[in-house]
A protein has these predicted regions:
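Conserved acetyl-CoA pyrophosphate-binding loop and the N-cap/start of the following alpha-helix
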Residues: 96, 100-108
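Conserved active-site alpha-helix within GNAT-family acetyltransferase domains
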Residues: 103, 127-145, 151
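A short beta-loop-alpha structural element at the N-terminal edge
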Residues: 8-20
Length: 164
């Protein structure tokens, strides 16, 4: 008889940082705009954990093992007149993909946004990645006429935590 699968989605904790950074390294290894750098990924996650008003990271555990995560950042939209979210990262470990875990994480994030009265969730996908775009469309996301642009700000102090 097969072991019953125990799947839980819950807020990540600082004890999860190492595993989360490994998931992000795996994600960024496949993205054109970013390079994997475990120290940067750890620093970014710590910045979220130190101020819960900045965002949330949820993990999906299968039988106690983290197999996926979703990272949501909070901001304000003057266009919408309220709080909105940026879905920064959604990643499922390669060995557990195509088993519905990404769907569960995204549905959890959407439910969280609704319960907390966020007005919108925005995300970016790779342009040629039609699989990811189809995945998000299936969950109600629509294309935007907005085109993302970036300006990389180089700093003298690579380890600077804040520029306030």
């Amino acid at each position: 008889m097969a072991e019953k699968e125990n799947v839980v989605i819950e807020p990540a904790t600082e004890a999860d940082l190492d595993e989360l950074s490994e998931l992000l390294v795996e994600l960024f290894a496949h993205e054109g705009d970013f390079r994997p750098d475990k120290n940067k990924q750890l620093r970014g996650l710590r910045l979220i954990f130190e101020q819960p008003s900045r965002g949330r990271v949820f993990v999906l555990r299968r039988n106690g093992v983290i197999v996926g995560m979703i990272n949501l950042l909070f901001t304000i939209s003057t266009a919408e007149g309220g709080f909105v979210m940026l879905l920064e990262d959604l990643v499922v470990h390669s060995q557990y993909q195509n088993q519905g875990y990404g769907n569960r994480l995204l549905e959890h994030a959407i439910d969280f946004a609704k319960k907390k009265n966020f007005l919108r969730i925005t995300l970016l996908t790779d342009r040629p990645e039609n699989v990811a775009q189809a995945f998000f469309r299936k969950h109600g996301f629509i294309d935007s006429s907005m085109i993302p642009m970036r300006l990389w700000i180089s700093t003298q102090n690579e380890g600077a935590e804040s520029k306030e």
